[in-house]
């Protein structure tokens, strides 16, 4: 569509989403000189326009500077803003977080495709540039890698084009608009358009130019697009590679290609063929190493465009990963091996920069994923920056690449399904926009081996438009599967070959798997990790070994979405929805991550790392069983360490290198010896990297297994050298032993004094408690209402009975408490004291039918205020709980207040 007259009407017309924008293409690097290949994305034919731009903010279009784009308009008086970046994080507009409902709820009464006339923030951007020498006299384009939500572009006062779709590149041919010397680029960005109705993701509602902006020029003959297709044969040892090219430029040229391995050896060379607008180059590669998340083997494809005399016009490079992903016998397979997605959903997010994240952020993220045994990411819920896909190719991460599509608020209101005005649904006026978003993602990302599955988007219900998108994916790229969870609610428009659900209970998944399923199952979202959470995850990972058709899931989600905010006293804090007086909002529902927004690792990650281990270690009294559940990697990449501890103190350790083939198991005897100590003996086995990798240093632990191989001897079974003195009073019973004294009260219902080395430790009698601070997920399921009588039980429990038993080497005291629950119940507390001052405490609650679930069962010990640190022998090092302790290790740990 060639149009030179912009119109604000486009903002409310879903059928106009691109004006003068060029077609999407592969994210390929290209150069005029072979020696420039090493520059990678800093290629000389590219000119970065990031930096400080002139900027003017308006709350709506009627207040904007209407003629700011004109060549003669003086912008020297307006403010500056940093590009890339969100305007809301640079002093303009307001930060707003919201989940499903649309952000204008309660402010404007709207229905698709309309937007507010009074509040639709406008950012008017201007920058000046001179075209660098390498780009002069060439066809030149401008690329906007990400602009939210809709924008108009002018160069030197001339209208260039218009585009929507926040998360894929928008590019325009500006060759005819450029001039010698200084050029003026003007961009007018609108926070809302008709596209806002289908960009209702669970995130902060930002706007502005938040990804890179750059110019690029192409040689006289240029490889405009590449689509790599591979066909593996001879038991996956060899491959035929077809490079389908779209060319622009001079027909008096030839094109050829060759493939290099990581050592720089040419392993396949094509014939030279003459120029054509569309052509295919053929290679046959022998003895290849396949790509997987475990072994991300990459090759480099070089495409050479030469003049007839042999002089180079252009060299194009493309990283290649050979892999074979398919549905085989109702199982998703990589190289015919069942794949399990140990995944997370990941928003692009930074506490300082929002979704305008940096390369450093991405490197931190991908190293964290690899270090925590996470092998897959769903790009929730939009295509990520192109660099992320290159990193996933290089480091080894499987991707579900998700289209920028979510219309949650149009069909689900207050948790109820009500799709009467759902978009895009089956509305023909939205279909082209939906398909354009799919095409923009596929065309850019189609050559990345990390992408295994195309996703039609998220939580947009169902209909003909999304169904047509799924048909497009399958026709365009049969080598990948198609995902869309939303059809679970409307199976008439089934789009996928696997079952995908959100937040199903493990028992519900098991019911599906036991009912002769026709499709394999994945959880595209599970383990809602909001706040203190991620308990019970083992109930899901246990299904991996039990059912072949259970193929894993994607935790919701990777990182908290919180923003730094400065308080009146100057202190910075991480702020959530509502903290910016944003209304409507969903408050702290943006905090669902395994990491905090500042990239501090949360205790939840400890559990995930363990349950996502690809190698299981099961130690016993003599050695360890190693179950290698990798698909392709032998355990000889790791060293096996063993550590024997006596009540947490090291008595023996060592290591060896062992070889266990993929998908096999082996028992390894360890030289750990026999130990006749009264203390508890624990064997910990650990697999650690034998060599450094891109993502961790040598010696980094990737898996562990632990077992108590000898229980602590009971105090009844060995003689105590310390004799106790029992003092019976009318109210108290005193127990005196070696360097300790304890007083148990018949009146108070427990210990009233506990002294070691004549030092008092406690302030009040310890009491049982049955209530804890509610977590975010508790509040989400109304736990505080359902279980509130346990709070009353904690506060109102009544001491009702006491008894005591004396033995030669110990004394046992029994206290019974009655709880004010309905029905009523009793709890018995037992103290067993030895002469050494060891006190074993047992709390016994048998359970009563008719009561709600017990939030917690514990004892509250109030210590003197002077104590500010403690050590313990128990599970650690991170916080753990009865349903989140698989990844914790038994040992001695220290902490402070």
Swiss-Prot record:
Enzyme class: hydrolase
Catalytic activity, EC: 3.2.1.23
Residue ranges crossing the lipid bilayer per the database entry: none
Induction of synthesis: Late in the ABE (acetone, butanol, and ethanol) fermentation and subject to glucose repression.
Record GO cellular component, one term: beta-galactosidase complex
UniProt keyword Hydrolase, yes or no: yes
Any one GO BP annotation for this protein: lactose catabolic process
Top-level taxon of the source organism: Bacteria
Chemical reaction(s) catalysed: Hydrolysis of terminal non-reducing beta-D-galactose residues in beta-D-galactosides
Active site: 459 (proton donor), 525 (nucleophile)
GO molecular function, one term: beta-galactosidase activity
Keywords from the UniProt entry: Glycosidase, Hydrolase
A Pfam family that the UniProt record links to this protein: Glyco_hydro_2_N
PROSITE patterns documented for this protein: GLYCOSYL_HYDROL_F2_1, GLYCOSYL_HYDROL_F2_2
Family per similarity comment: Belongs to the glycosyl hydrolase 2 family.
Name of protein: Beta-galactosidase
Taxonomic source organism: Clostridium acetobutylicum
């Amino acid at each position: 569509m060639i149009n030179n007259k912009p119109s604000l009407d486009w903002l409310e017309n879903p059928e106009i989403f691109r004006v003068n924008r060029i077609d999407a293409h592969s994210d390929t690097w290209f150069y005029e000189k072979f020696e420039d290949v090493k520059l990678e994305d800093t290629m000389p034919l590219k000119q970065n326009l990031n930096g400080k731009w002139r900027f003017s903010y308006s709350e709506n279009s009627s207040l904007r500077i209407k003629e700011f784009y004109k060549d003669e308009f003086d912008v020297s008086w307006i403010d500056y803003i940093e590009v890339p970046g969100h305007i809301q994080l640079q002093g303009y507009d307001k930060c707003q977080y919201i989940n499903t409902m649309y952000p204008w709820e309660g402010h404007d009464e709207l229905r698709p495709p309309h937007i507010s006339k009074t509040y639709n923030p406008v950012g008017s951007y201007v920058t000046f540039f001179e075209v660098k020498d390498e780009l002069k006299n060439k066809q030149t384009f401008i690329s906007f890698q990400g602009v939210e939500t809709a924008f108009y572009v002018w160069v030197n006062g001339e209208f260039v084009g218009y585009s929507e779709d926040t998360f894929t590149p928008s590019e325009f041919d500006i060759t005819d608009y450029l001039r010698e010397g200084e050029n003026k680029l003007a961009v007018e960005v609108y926070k809302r358009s008709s596209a806002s109705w289908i960009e209702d993701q669970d995130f902060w509602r930002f706007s502005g130019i938040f990804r890179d902006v750059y110019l690029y020029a192409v040689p006289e003959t240029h490889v405009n697009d590449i689509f790599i297709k591979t066909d593996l044969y001879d038991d996956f040892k060899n491959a035929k590679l077809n490079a389908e090219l779209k060319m622009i430029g001079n027909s008096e040229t030839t094109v050829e290609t060759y493939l290099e391995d990581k050592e720089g050896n040419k392993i396949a060379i094509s014939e030279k063929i003459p120029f054509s607008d569309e052509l295919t180059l053929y290679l046959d590669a022998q003895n290849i190493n396949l790509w997987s998340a475990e072994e991300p083997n990459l090759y480099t494809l070089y495409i050479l465009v030469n003049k007839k005399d042999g002089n180079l016009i252009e060299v194009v490079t493309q990283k290649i990963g050979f892999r074979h992903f398919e549905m085989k016998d109702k199982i998703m397979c990589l190289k015919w091996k069942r794949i399990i997605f140990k995944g997370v959903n990941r928003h692009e997010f930074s506490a300082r920069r929002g979704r305008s994240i940096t390369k450093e952020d991405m490197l931190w993220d991908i190293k964290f994923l690899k270090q925590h045994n996470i092998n897959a990411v769903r790009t929730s819920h939009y295509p990520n920056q192109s660099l992320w896909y290159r990193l996933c190719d290089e480091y080894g991460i499987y991707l579900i690449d998700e289209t920028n599509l979510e219309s949650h608020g149009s069909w689900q209101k207050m948790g109820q399904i009500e799709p009467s005005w759902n978009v895009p649904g089956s509305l023909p006026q939205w279909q082209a926009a939906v398909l354009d978003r799919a095409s923009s993602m596929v065309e850019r990302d189609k050559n990345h081996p990390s992408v295994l599955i195309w996703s039609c988007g998220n939580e947009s219900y169902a209909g003909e438009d999304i169904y047509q998108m799924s048909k497009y994916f399958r026709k365009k790229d049969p080598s990948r599967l198609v995902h869309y969870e939303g059809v679970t609610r409307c199976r008439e428009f089934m789009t996928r070959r696997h079952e995908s659900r959100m937040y199903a209970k493990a028992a519900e998944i098991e019911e599906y798997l036991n009912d002769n399923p026709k499709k394999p199952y994945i959880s595209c979202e599970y383990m809602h990790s909001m706040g203190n959470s991620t308990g019970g995850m083992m109930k899901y990972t246990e299904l991996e070994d039990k059912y072949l058709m259970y193929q894993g899931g994607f935790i919701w989600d990777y990182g908290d979405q919180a923003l730094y905010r400065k308080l009146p006293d100057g202190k910075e804090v991480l702020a959530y929805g509502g903290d910016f007086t944003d209304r409507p909002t969903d408050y702290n529902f943006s905090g669902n991550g395994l990491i905090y927004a500042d990239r501090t690792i949360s205790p939840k990650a400890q559990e995930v790392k363990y349950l996502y281990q690809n190698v299981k270690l099961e130690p016993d009294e003599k050695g360890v069983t190693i179950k290698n559940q990798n698909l392709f990697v032998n355990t000889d990449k790791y060293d096996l360490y063993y550590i024997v501890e006596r009540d947490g103190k090291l008595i023996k350790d060592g290591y060896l290198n062992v070889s266990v083939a993929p998908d096999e198991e082996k028992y390894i005897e360890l030289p750990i010896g026999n130990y006749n100590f009264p203390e508890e003996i624990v064997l910990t086995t650990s697999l650690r990297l034998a060599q450094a990798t891109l993502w961790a240093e040598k010696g980094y632990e990737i898996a562990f297994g632990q077992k108590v191989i000898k229980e602590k001897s009971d105090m009844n079974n060995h003689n105590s050298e310390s004799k106790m003195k029992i003092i019976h009073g009318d109210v108290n019973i005193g127990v005196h032993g070696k360097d300790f004294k304890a007083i148990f009260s018949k009146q108070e219902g427990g210990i009233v004094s506990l002294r070691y080395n004549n030092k008092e430790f406690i302030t009040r009698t310890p009491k049982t408690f049955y209530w804890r601070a509610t977590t975010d997920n508790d509040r989400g399921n109304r736990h505080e209402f359902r279980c509130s009588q346990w709070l009353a039980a904690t506060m109102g429990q009544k001491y009702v009975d006491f008894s005591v038993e004396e033995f030669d080497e110990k004394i046992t005291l029994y206290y019974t408490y009655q709880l004010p629950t309905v029905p009523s119940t009793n709890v018995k507390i037992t103290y067993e004291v030895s002469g050494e001052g060891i006190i074993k405490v047992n709390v016994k609650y048998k359970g009563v039918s008719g009561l709600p679930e017990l939030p917690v069962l514990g004892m509250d010990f109030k210590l003197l205020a002077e104590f500010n640190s403690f050590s313990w022998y128990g599970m650690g090092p991170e916080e753990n709980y009865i349903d989140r302790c698989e990844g914790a290790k038994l040992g001695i740990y220290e902490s402070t207040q």
